[in-house]
């Protein structure tokens, strides 16, 4: 996926969900761990040289898996490129757990699944589709997946 560099730089300056200096090792063989300032903004993980204001890279946190590798180390692996693995070293186990949790929750897919879940719950409790008022209830991206029971059809108008 291609991105406009100026837009990414602008996005990298927005308020962060999480930011810290972490050890980071890239996906190439022979890459070594380097201190990087890492910022989580929406579903992007930006990384900077510690003395610079513009990011040297960004990871789009979609279609990836986040795993704890060690007590203070986690990795990000992209599902379509298993060899593309990034390692991050934290200062503590707690910091590592917080980063893993934040990154998992940053993805569009996580947010979509939550929306579908809460939509189903609201519909179950009230009998109303909360998305109907916005005219988006029939959009595929908001449909219930096979893990959840399907929404019953709306009641006929009275």
Curated annotation (Swiss-Prot):
Species this chain originates from: Danio rerio (Zebrafish)
Return the PROSITE patterns for the record: PH_DOMAIN (PS50003)
Q: CDD domains from the xrefs? A: PH_PLEKHJ1 (cd13258)
The GO annotation for biological process reads: endosome organization; receptor recycling; retrograde transport, endosome to Golgi
Q: Where is the PH domain?
A: 15-108
Q: What is this protein called?
A: Pleckstrin homology domain-containing family J member 1
User: Can you tell which superkingdom this protein's organism belongs to?
Assistant: Eukaryota
Sorted alphabetically, which SUPFAM superfamilies does this protein's record hold?
Answer: PH domain-like (SSF50729)
